[in-house]
Amino acid sequence: MNLIPTVVEKNARGERSYDIFSRLLKERIIFVTGKIEDYMANLIIAQMIFLESEDPEKDIFLYINSPGGVVTSGMSIYDTMQFIKCEVSTLCIGQSSSMAALILASGEKGKRFSLPNARIMIHQPLGGSQGQATDIAIHTTEILKIKKCMIELLSKHTGQSAEIISKDTERDRFFSGSEAVIYGLIDKVITCRK
């Protein structure tokens, strides 16, 4: 069962009820939660484009708690973040693993954060294929292209060399918030709002 809390706002004209995520969207906060897949990615993209149309000069805030997921779905979020005029601030709450770690790292420089006990994990893309040998070879070539692309993007956003990223993504590499700052995945660990 998926229960979503509601909030009630009162003003001079009466009351209005919102689900909590719609209310937070008014504050330009978008949640990236759970496995990244096409449906979820499309919702996030639609929210970013909507907020850009509302005010292209104001920041958008992505709150991330995700184990990662489908690379193409994550890349659609990544590409939209780069495409829109708004600066996108990212905050890891819980975990940002795999594709979610790239989304976290690709926030606006100086506006990439994590909470103190959040975990961040990078690794190479995962895949599997079956079928004829020719089809398996095609999929192998494609996943190697994706791996190269992911290494280049992580290198761009962290400042680490492609060689270091390649070595560090051979297996799961976990970071605490402070370790992620040193590595360049985020800019700061935050403990409270100011």
Swiss-Prot record:
HAMAP family named in the record: ClpP (MF_00444)
Family annotation (InterPro entries): ClpP, ClpP/crotonase-like_dom_sf, ClpP/TepA, ClpP_His_AS
Physiological role: Cleaves peptides in various proteins in a process that requires ATP hydrolysis. Has a chymotrypsin-like activity. Plays a major role in the degradation of misfolded proteins.
Family (UniProt): Belongs to the peptidase S14 family.
Classification via PANTHER family: ATP-DEPENDENT CLP PROTEASE PROTEOLYTIC SUBUNIT (PTHR10381:SF70)
Molecular function as annotated in GO: ATP-dependent peptidase activity; ATPase binding; serine-type endopeptidase activity
Organism: Wigglesworthia glossinidia brevipalpis
Keyword set includes Hydrolase: yes
Known partners and oligomeric status: Fourteen ClpP subunits assemble into 2 heptameric rings which stack back to back to give a disk-like structure with a central cavity, resembling the structure of eukaryotic proteasomes.
Protein name per the record: ATP-dependent Clp protease proteolytic subunit
